[in-house]
Amino acid sequence: MGFNVFVTRLLPPEGMEMLRAACATVDVFPHDRPPTKQEIIRAVKGKKRDGLLCLLCDPIDRDVVDALGSTIKGIADYAVGYNNIDVARATELGIPVSNTPGVLTHATADLAWALLFAAARRIVESDKFTRAGRFLGWAPMLHRGADVTGATLGVVGAGRIGAAFALKSKGFNMRVLYHDPSRNEALEKELSAKRVDLDTLLRESDFVSLHVPLVPETRHLINAEKLALMKPTACLINTSRGPVVDEAALVEALKNKKIAGAGLDVYENEPALAPGLAELDNVVMVAHIGSATTSTRAKMAQMAAADLIARMKGDRPQNCVNPEVYEKKHRT
């Protein structure tokens, strides 16, 4: 087969091997950093690409989609969220876009719990303290954190990841509140979870974990006004998308002890951090590693490759995020 594909970063071998077996040409961006928009355009424009496999940090905007040319048959995003792609423009041009849902659900939910515990029990702060040689022996007031067992857990977004995160609370005897446009009967049955409005959730929760997609309605969903509703003992966890939180407002809330702590996997202007964030002891930060387990990343690579190959062969990708392209005449 003579398929011609561009991949914006070297993926785990499980996915790369699938692409190389199915394609005549698989070009990979050679640097271990996100390519710029112009670098992506140069890699695809006039190159007669059949497929593009990109990452969540790649800016696949209108200009990039237009540069793909008439030969492009599909775009595969190595992520569950696809706000980095101008899906509307791809749909106009009849280009199916796929993502990798489901496979990273538990890895991301697990990381949210890791951040919750790290923030609640001040683990990173205590680790630094110990490494610095400041630990002089057990002390009754040293690094006291918050109880998790028996606390109130607020889950904002009860889709795949949010629901999995909530269900993992079962062993901690927590009261669970959730906020979502749709009712989640499984959470209500398994956890006696209560669906509430966002303000109620923020006021009553000891831990608030965000699991919403980034759409116009969720940008700065958590702003200064919403942070002011939270308990001064509460912690905010974000493993969704950075712009869901007004990061400058979060810095002020943490600095002024309006909330007790935060655990962040994502950032508003990733990879840049809001001024002052890195200097705070009451925030735990990791480098967008929600799906970063060996097996999860391998499965994501296989899923993205399989959908791209299917589309190039003329089949419908399993995880198409713009199925409306199949209501029109599109490239085959």
Where are these regions (language model features)?
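An N-terminal-biased, well-structured beta-alpha scaffold segment characteristic
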Residues: 1-98, 223, 329
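Rossmann-like dinucleotide/phosphate-binding beta-alpha-beta segment
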Residues: 21, 138-232
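Short beta->alpha connector loops at strand-helix junctions that form conserved
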Residues: 29-32, 78-79, 95-106, 180, ...
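A short, aliphatic-rich alpha-helical micro-motif
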Residues: 44-47, 65, 69, 148, ...
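Short glycine-/small-residue-rich Rossmann-like dinucleotide-binding loops
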Residues: 56-57, 80, 206, 212-214, ...
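Residue-level detector of alpha-helix initiation sites
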Residues: 59, 81-84, 99, 103-104, ...
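Phosphate-binding beta-alpha-beta segment of Rossmann-like dinucleotide-binding domains, i.e.
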Residues: 93, 101-152, 164-167, 317-323
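Rossmann-like dinucleotide-binding domain for NAD(H)/NADP(H)
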Residues: 97, 233-332
